[in-house]
């Protein structure tokens, strides 16, 4: 059987951007943890457009690490793109994701897999004692609090890179933009069983963190996208219709007021407030029309494509 067709028990997917200094040690630790488990496994490193010679090192490391596979991007496409490519190439029944900076401990892999064996489909790590700078810790806590309260999925650490997935989960998820932050939420909405366990978090040994304020802001914007897609996917008219009705009600109220003024006074001049009422009614009609068009688009697609079937007889 060709290598590309061989199934594995376990795939480890590692997005890497300018993490050359940590790659050799990370692979050594992974082999040391996984080999005693007696599992067939592969390690897929996605070089996300690194400028530090990571790909050259990965070519060398393939000679001493038979389980290693790597993909080199032409440029930096982001963590979501790296995970999507890794998921598409994974052959394992279980897929582990982790960061390449040695802050995620490979020794946690058996615990993650044991939790999957309890019947869960996705197990997310919870960095209970983070070894990150104060600003990164604070923004991460705020992000996780807002996400947990908005989404209805109670997790402490949505963005932990260390996660375990059943293969059917990675095959079902669409990862793009900054959606890697919300994979537990997306899986939960699709009906998969999601949980978390505390994991050790190590101080960064090499390089610099890729965290920035823009990533936090982008993540919050993507949260609105996720909430809209998960809650209004099957009936977008409910969302656009409510917005349209709100504008329409306000605009109609203004126009009715001026109608009674006209009845009472017998004359009515064109006033800015009346123009606002007319404009609000037109905006309401546009929102409702947009909702109807979105409904037609949803109806034209296979509406069962997002339904996950656990079993059938």
What spans do the regions from the language model cover?
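Acidic helix N-cap motif at the loop->helix transition within catalytic regions
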Residues: 21-25, 52-61
């Amino acid at each position: 059987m060709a290598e590309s067709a061989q199934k594995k028990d376990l795939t480890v997917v590692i997005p890497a951007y300018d993490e050359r200094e940590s790659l050799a040690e990370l692979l050594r630790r992974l082999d040391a943890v996984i080999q005693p488990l007696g599992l067939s496994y592969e390690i897929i490193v996605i070089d996300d457009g690194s400028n530090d010679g990571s790909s050259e090192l990965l070519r060398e490391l393939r000679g001493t690490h038979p389980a290693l596979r790597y993909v080199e991007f032409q440029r930096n496409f982001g963590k979501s793109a790296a995970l999507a490519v890794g998921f598409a190439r994974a052959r394992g029944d279980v897929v582990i994701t982790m960061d390449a900076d040695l802050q995620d401990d490979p020794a946690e892999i058996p615990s993650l897999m044991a939790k999957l064996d309890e019947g869960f489909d996705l197990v997310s790590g919870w960095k209970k004692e983070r070894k990150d700078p104060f600003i990164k810790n604070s923004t991460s806590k705020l992000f996780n609090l807002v996400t947990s309260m908005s989404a209805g999925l109670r997790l402490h650490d949505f963005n932990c890179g260390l996660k375990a997935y059943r293969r059917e989960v990675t095959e079902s998820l669409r990862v793009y933009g900054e959606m890697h932050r919300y994979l537990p939420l997306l899986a939960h909405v699709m009906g998969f069983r999601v949980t978390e366990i505390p994991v050790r978090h190590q101080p960064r040994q090499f390089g610099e963190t890729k965290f920035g304020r823009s990533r936090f802001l982008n993540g919050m914007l993507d949260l609105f996208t996720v909430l809209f897609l998960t809650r209004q996917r099957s009936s977008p008219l409910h969302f656009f219709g409510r917005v349209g009705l709100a504008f329409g009600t306000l605009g109609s109220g203004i126009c009715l007021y001026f109608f009674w003024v006209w009845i009472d006074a017998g004359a009515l001049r064109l006033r800015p407030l009346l123009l606002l009422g007319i404009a609000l009614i037109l905006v309401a009609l546009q929102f409702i029309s947009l909702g109807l068009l979105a409904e037609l688009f949803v109806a034209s697609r296979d509406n069962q494509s997002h339904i996950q079937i656990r079993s059938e007889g």
